[in-house]
């Protein structure tokens, strides 16, 4: 995990560098609009550091907060985090209870005044099969959603409890119930009933812990053309802003290259026109 150094002024330099980096990325207009995170490795991190599993999950929350701050400062519109899989209910009752308690505390925290939602104008959406949550937690979810519903700058989708298969099943049921008899149904119809409907399409998916699978997360969205997937060999609590900044930078360069390539296909590229397509017949030769 990236930690502050004891060098005088280190925190100030890091903050200053992050601000410059974020402004540069925003100005490039090549930032991913929607980033998804599979935050894997909290339990292994706890074992590695010989700490309680709950402490591992708490370390993961700290990492998530730092990563999301960088994303929103850099201009990312939507972040979707895989907080709790429906499959996780199969874990020990002690761990499930601990995760639910932690979720309740953190949902309250990120919606408090001065915290993530307030600081960056983030609208909180809890997506998944909410019928699996107890009444007290559902009330915290309702308050978080209600408190942030008028925030327009960015969105945070918290998948809790969630699986991609359940999301698709939910979308199919909603389509059947709401669609008029005899009307055509296509991919866009189904997409309009996904939990992520109304936010930009997924651009970038990041998974930690060195595992090469999606683990039933955003499986419909990740299948779209152009989605970049980053599989990292570090555990989630070890994933920090510096590595995230590098990923955003790579994405920006890649998108910039594709945009330039597209313009070259549509028309000649000219530095005098900032790369806009030009008509050779109208261009005067010196």
Swiss-Prot record:
Assembly and oligomerization: Forms an active dehydrodolichyl diphosphate synthase complex with NUS1.
Q: What is its EC number?
A: 2.5.1.87
Could you confirm whether the keyword Acyltransferase appears in this record? no
Keywords for this entry?
Endoplasmic reticulum, Magnesium, Membrane, Transferase
**Pfam families attached to this UniProt entry:** Prenyltransf (PF01255)
Q: What family is reported? A: Belongs to the UPP synthase family.
InterPro entries xrefs:
UPP_synth-like, UPP_synth-like_CS, UPP_synth-like_sf
Any extra detail in the entry?
Present with 8970 molecules/cell in log phase SD medium.
Q: Which cofactor does it need?
A: Mg(2+)
Q: Which reaction does it catalyse?
A: n isopentenyl diphosphate + (2E,6E)-farnesyl diphosphate = a di-trans,poly-cis-polyprenyl diphosphate + n diphosphate
Q: What induces it?
A: Mainly expressed in the early logarithmic phase.
Its gene is RER2
Say what the protein does.
Answer: With NUS1, forms the dehydrodolichyl diphosphate synthase (DDS) complex, an essential component of the dolichol monophosphate (Dol-P) biosynthetic machinery. Adds multiple copies of isopentenyl pyrophosphate (IPP) to farnesyl pyrophosphate (FPP) to produce dehydrodolichyl diphosphate (Dedol-PP), a precursor of dolichol which is utilized as a sugar carrier in protein glycosylation in the endoplasmic reticulum (ER).
PANTHER family hit by this protein: DEHYDRODOLICHYL DIPHOSPHATE SYNTHASE COMPLEX SUBUNIT DHDDS (PTHR10291:SF43), DEHYDRODOLICHYL DIPHOSPHATE SYNTHASE FAMILY MEMBER (PTHR10291)
Q: Share an example GO biological-process annotation for this protein.
A: protein glycosylation
**Which compartments does it reside in?**
Endoplasmic reticulum membrane
Protein name per UniProt: Dehydrodolichyl diphosphate synthase complex subunit RER2
Q: Which domain of life is it from?
A: Eukaryota
Q: Provide a Gene Ontology MF annotation, just one.
A: ditrans,polycis-polyprenyl diphosphate synthase [(2E,6E)-farnesyl diphosphate specific] activity
Q: Which residues form the signal peptide?
A: none
The answer to whether the entry has keyword Disulfide bond is no
Q: Please name the source species.
A: Saccharomyces cerevisiae (strain ATCC 204508 / S288c) (Baker's yeast)
Q: In which pathway does it act?
A: Protein modification; protein glycosylation
What is this entry's stated membrane topology? Peripheral membrane protein
Q: Which GO terms describe its cellular component?
A: dehydrodolichyl diphosphate synthase complex; endoplasmic reticulum; endoplasmic reticulum membrane; lipid droplet; membrane
């Amino acid at each position: 995990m990236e930690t502050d150094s004891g060098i005088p002024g280190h925190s100030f330099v890091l903050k200053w560098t992050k601000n410059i980096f974020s402004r540069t990325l925003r100005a490039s207009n090549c930032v991913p609009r929607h980033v998804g995170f599979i935050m894997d490795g909290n339990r292994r991190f706890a074992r590695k550091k010989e700490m309680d599993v709950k402490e591992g999950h708490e370390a993961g929350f700290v990492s998530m907060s730092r990563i999301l701050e960088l994303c929103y400062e850099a201009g990312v519109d939507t972040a979707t985090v895989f907080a709790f899989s429906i499959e996780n209910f199969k874990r020990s009752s002690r761990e499930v209870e601990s995760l639910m308690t932690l979720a309740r505390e953190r949902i309250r925290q990120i919606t408090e005044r001065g915290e993530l939602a307030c600081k960056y104008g983030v609208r909180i959406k809890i997506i998944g099969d909410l019928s699996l949550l107890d009444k007290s937690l559902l009330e915290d979810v309702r308050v978080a959603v209600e408190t942030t519903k008028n925030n327009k700058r960015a969105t945070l989708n918290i998948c809790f409890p969630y699986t991609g298969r359940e999301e698709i099943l939910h979308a199919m049921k909603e389509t059947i119930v709401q669609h008029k008899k005899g009307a055509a149904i296509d991919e866009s119809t189904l997409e309009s009933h996904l939990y992520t409907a109304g936010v930009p399409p997924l651009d970038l998916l990041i998974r930690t812990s060195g595992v090469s699978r999606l683990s039933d997360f955003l499986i419909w969205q990740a299948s779209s053309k152009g989605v970049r997937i980053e599989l990292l060999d570090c555990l989630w609590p070890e994933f920090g802003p510096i590595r995230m900044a590098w990923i955003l930078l790579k994405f920006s360069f890649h998108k910039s290259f594709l945009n330039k390539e597209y313009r070259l296909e549509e028309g000649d590229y000219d530095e005098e026109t900032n790369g806009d397509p030009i008509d050779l017949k109208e261009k005067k030769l010196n």
